[in-house]
A protein has these predicted regions:
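N-terminal Rossmann-like or analogous alpha/beta NTP/dinucleotide-binding catalytic cores
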Residues: 1-90, 144, 158, 185-203
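Active-site cores that bind ATP or allylic diphosphates and position pyrophosphate for catalysis
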Residues: 66, 71-203
Length: 203
């Protein structure tokens, strides 16, 4: 009795290919795969292009900021590149060093007023263990100290996959998620976002 929803995940504008969405819809139709909701049919959960849902993602990002579950980061590309090079030189894991986690409200306000570009990052709690059950792999445990403070909202105002999918999966009432192997390590980040927003984590 579930619904089949087609959602177009087009938040990475650098990889946008003209005509690709039409090809996807056409090929799925040729395979006999039909949708209850989507860009063609419409429905209660629209819009179905993530690029048309930016205000929705911004709203929830603001909630995460207010609750202390996310923060502004004003690092330049050059600063981030220097940070990664130093980590590699020292043989450390390459990840954000959380330098912007503890910026004061005044510092954030001044940076915003000056128009300094920013991203919004997930404030991953330290020294915790995230557990989740995978139907294939069983129980998986991840130390939060090894989880990057993931970017949620990019400097261009577009969300990353992590924020957009959590928000959309919740609002579209998705109950079960099938992931590729490469996305399993992202599950703890998604769980943290669900928790911070007070939402139930899907299976």
């Amino acid at each position: 009795n579930g619904k089949n929803i087609l959602r177009i995940e087009d938040t990475d504008q650098t990889r946008k290919v003209e005509g690709a969405v039409d090809n996807v819809i056409s090929n799925l139709s040729l395979l006999g795969i039909e949708f209850d909701e989507g860009p063609v049919q419409g429905g209660d959960s629209g819009p179905y292009y993530q690029s048309e849902r930016l205000d929705i993602y911004k709203k929830y990002c603001d909630e995460l900021i207010k609750s202390g579950a996310a923060y502004y980061a004003f690092d330049t590309p050059e600063e981030l590149d220097e940070m990664r090079k130093l980590q590699q030189l020292e043989g450390r894991q390459t990840m954000y060093d959380r330098r912007a986690r503890d910026l004061s409200m005044n510092e954030v306000s001044e940076n915003l007023k000056s128009g300094k570009p920013y991203v919004i990052r997930l404030k991953v709690p330290l020294n915790e263990e995230i557990r989740f059950d995978d139907l294939i792999k069983g129980t998986i445990k991840i130390d939060t100290n090894n989880i990057d403070d993931q970017i949620l909202l990019k400097s261009d105002g577009f969300p990353t996959y992590h924020l957009a999918n959590v928000v959309d999966d919740h609002l579209m009432k998705i109950t079960h998620i099938i992931r590729g192997e490469e996305w399993v390590t992202s599950v703890p980040k998604h769980i943290l976002i669900y928790r911070a927003l007070g939402w139930e984590v899907p299976h």
